[in-house]
């Protein structure tokens, strides 16, 4: 009987089967990631009464995060500056801009601006900004390159799984306290590891900082009570 199919057909058939087996989980994984990002409103700019640009103020003008977020090193909340802080500059700069009309009105009336929350954690989750800052967690680790953001938005899901990834392996994320505010920081910026004679890797430096900053054991960091109380 004459051969109906070319010998290469077997290879093609196997490739289709393997592609189907591997492709379906891949599609499911991609779909799950997209759904998670959408559900958690990741990369979605939030409309505000005043379109404040972190990029303009931080990257372009070099204003330190703590000039506006004054409580971040000692309070559970980073804090939103009142309009007195805004007007300390804008009474002299861009004072006639229509964009600043709500800021000026708030300053005169004493009524705060009703900003729309960007990072809205569930009511039953406890998060302490000062604790993370003082343990070497950089702003960038949670807020991404906020210095490059014309409009504020979430860049991570802030899901429990996302938090646990850090709590289980803090050495992957820690940096020296003085570098907490430095955007684009890399472990190699910390200098030479005397044990290797080479620039620090993140794991080398992070492991050192876990001990130096007395970071709790994974068992404590992943205990329900640590964040839910």
Predicted features by range, described:
Residues 99-102, 114:
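Extended active-site neighborhood of metal-dependent phosphoesterases/phosphodiesterases
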Residues 14-32:
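Hydrophobic membrane-insertion alpha-helices, especially the h-region
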Residues 1-10:
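N-terminal Lys/Arg-rich, disordered targeting/topogenic segments
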Residues 46-99, 128-229:
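Sequence context surrounding c-type heme c attachment/ligation sites in exported
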Residues 28-46:
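Aromatic-capped interface at the extracytoplasmic side
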Residues 104-107, 135:
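Amphipathic alpha-helical "stem/stalk" segments
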Residues 115-133:
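Short, solvent-exposed interaction modules
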